[in-house]
């Protein structure tokens, strides 16, 4: 029961801040995060901006969703998604952690949920 409550609370926080992670941070941390994102964009030739555009395009298509599978534990993975500003393109129910169950199980769950005929 405690685990279910914990995940409900995590979901509430994720959904509340998925488009504004800065709301979780102090003004100084928010500014530092923005500087860090800017530096990352410069160093990676706008990787994050390009990735976000691609993910938004996929999300805008009929019958298309973005799914993230990670080997990071779920809560830290959710934090990273928010910090990178990708919460709006990855609904929490489409983020899978393979840490405890493995990638194969994640793919089985996705196939069970969406079917085999996917692109």
From Swiss-Prot:
Keywords: Activator, Chromatin regulator, Cytoplasm, Developmental protein, DNA damage, DNA repair, Hydrolase, Magnesium, Metal-binding, Nucleus, Protein phosphatase, Transcription, Transcription regulation. One of its GO terms (biological process) is double-strand break repair. Its EC number is 3.1.3.48. GO terms for molecular function: histone H2AXY142 phosphatase activity; metal ion binding; protein tyrosine phosphatase activity. It catalyses: O-phospho-L-tyrosyl-[protein] + H2O = L-tyrosyl-[protein] + phosphate. It is found in: Cytoplasm; Nucleus. The keyword Cell wall biogenesis/degradation does not apply. GO terms for cellular component: cytoplasm; nucleus. It comes from the Eukaryota. Its cofactor is Mg(2+). Binds 1 Mg(2+) ion per subunit. InterPro entries: EYA (IPR028472), EYA_dom_sf (IPR038102). It is an enzyme of class 3 (hydrolase). Belongs to the HAD-like hydrolase superfamily. EYA family. Tyrosine phosphatase that specifically dephosphorylates 'Tyr-142' of histone H2AX (H2AXY142ph). 'Tyr-142' phosphorylation of histone H2AX plays a central role in DNA repair and acts as a mark that distinguishes between apoptotic and repair responses to genotoxic stress. Promotes efficient DNA repair by dephosphorylating H2AX, promoting the recruitment of DNA repair complexes containing MDC1. Its function as histone phosphatase probably explains its role in transcription regulation during organogenesis. May be involved in development of the eye. This is Protein phosphatase EYA3.
